[in-house]
Regions:
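Hydrophobic, small-residue-rich alpha-helical packing segments that form membrane-like cores
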Residues: 1-3
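Exposed, low-structure sequence patches enriched in small/polar residues
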Residues: 5-178
Length: 178
């Protein structure tokens, strides 16, 4: 909107990498892919590849002004996305989304300079729908008139799966946790 209360942003990036079979095996074995995992179904290691392509996309909605707060995003990084030539790559093969709502009090009262409370949900999986994170979180903080503050954070994570803890081995179940 023209007041920039609500802002929608997004991006789409593509990548294409080619090279020798040995080079592509190295790319497939990177910690952000682990295509050599024995239980990998979607895009497993292919020793005959001489090129790989992928994409990154993310869309975000943010309510920036006012006391009521909303932030939501959905992002996708395909298993073949490769941008390591630009710097340091630390993820691929991810689908992530979150929704955060909250309320912020900016006007001081008799005790607090400002206060806020946020409740959110997030979920991250890969292209095989191995859920690596799914949970709720609560964040609350207050700032006293003397500029001291207190923050409280808690979260509950549902049972999930790690495809990286064994560094290319089989996936592991992670119990729910607080």
């Amino acid at each position: 909107d023209e007041d920039e209360t609500y802002v929608i942003t997004g991006s789409v990036i593509g990548s294409y990498t080619s090279g020798t079979e040995d080079y592509l095996i190295k790319l497939q074995n990177q910690p952000y892919r682990y295509m050599q995992r024995p239980d990998k179904i979607y895009m497993p290691l292919d020793s005959s590849l001489t090129s790989i392509g992928g994409y990154f996309s993310r869309v975000m909605l943010n309510k920036q002004k006012g006391n009521f707060y909303v932030n939501a995003a959905l992002g996708i990084i395909s298993p073949g996305f490769e941008y390591n030539d630009l710097g340091s790559q630390w993820m691929a093969d991810k689908i992530n989304g979150h929704l955060v709502t909250g309320y912020r009090w900016y006007e001081p009262d008799d005790v607090f300079r400002n206060k806020s409370v946020y409740l959110g949900y997030s979920r991250t999986s890969d292209f095989e729908d191995n859920i690596s994170r799914s949970g709720f979180y609560l964040n609350s903080n207050v700032q006293f008139l003397n500029y001291w503050g207190i923050n409280f954070n808690t979260s509950y994570n549902f049972k999930s799966v790690s495809t990286t803890l064994t560094r290319g081995g089989p996936k592991l179940n992670i119990p729910s946790n607080i």
